[in-house]
């Protein structure tokens, strides 16, 4: 299975730099079996069935972009930092500019309330240990940090305060992600309430999306690719709700690839179980899904692991047809773009 099998031409004009307003006005490509329909997210109330269960990732994006200063004697230098993920040895793994000029033991000052020491430095990133922890760290980061937009948006415009709202889901609870579970950005409170009134169930899980989600695949034989690891949790309650839905004949529908990867990790034995830890599950064609019946997700980058995931769910030829339709009909792509609802079979 070659990387080139997952390539397609995407006009740059289809890369969304702002979301639809309101959130539910985003377009929705409904693909069920061989059928494709052009709908809108607000139409989900009539598409989902009573007894369906949506699995939502309740991670909260932290303001992971920081600008600080490093001082040597009388000289000060500006340093830009993007937090990537908590480090096993303590502190945070981070990218920094200029990385090559930083030295272990140096302190970067981000504000009067937040500083960090360079504990380790590698070829591509470093480990920072902050002078605050817990709630004090969260508060200082909220003051000093900015929302970490995906690179394909940040390359086209500067982040602003509107992104603080746009790049956060309405059910975000547990801080720790440095990228949003973007399919969930399409939901607002009225839509959630309307779906609940229809008899659709909701289960929340937590997967802290890391910066590794944007890393390119660098091998031609995709089966040899190694995924980045991300921390997640499926609680006892969540596992029981999903199991009950399956037993009752309902559909389990993750909202976003992060929720899908997490519940499939928790069902590695064949049945969904409570689960907590790091997952590096890599889903590509040939994978046998254990609990997922359908998926709501945005449109993904060419040659990405997420395109491989949806190809595993729907089949490679079917995904090619779906993406060809999306491009021809001017669907908006990536994090702030439109959505698809992928239902195999039908």
Curated annotation (Swiss-Prot):
User: Its Gene Ontology biological processes?
Assistant: queuosine biosynthetic process; tRNA wobble guanine modification
| Keyword presence, Cytoplasm | yes
Give the record's GO CC terms. cytoplasm
Print the keywords alphabetically: Cytoplasm, Queuosine biosynthesis, S-adenosyl-L-methionine, Transferase
- Tell me the function of this protein: Transfers and isomerizes the ribose moiety from AdoMet to the 7-aminomethyl group of 7-deazaguanine (preQ1-tRNA) to give epoxyqueuosine (oQ-tRNA).
Q: State the similarity comment.
A: Belongs to the QueA family.
Stated name of the protein: S-adenosylmethionine:tRNA ribosyltransferase-isomerase
Source organism of this protein record: Cereibacter sphaeroides (strain ATCC 17023 / DSM 158 / JCM 6121 / CCUG 31486 / LMG 2827 / NBRC 12203 / NCIMB 8253 / ATH 2.4.1.) (Rhodobacter sphaeroides)
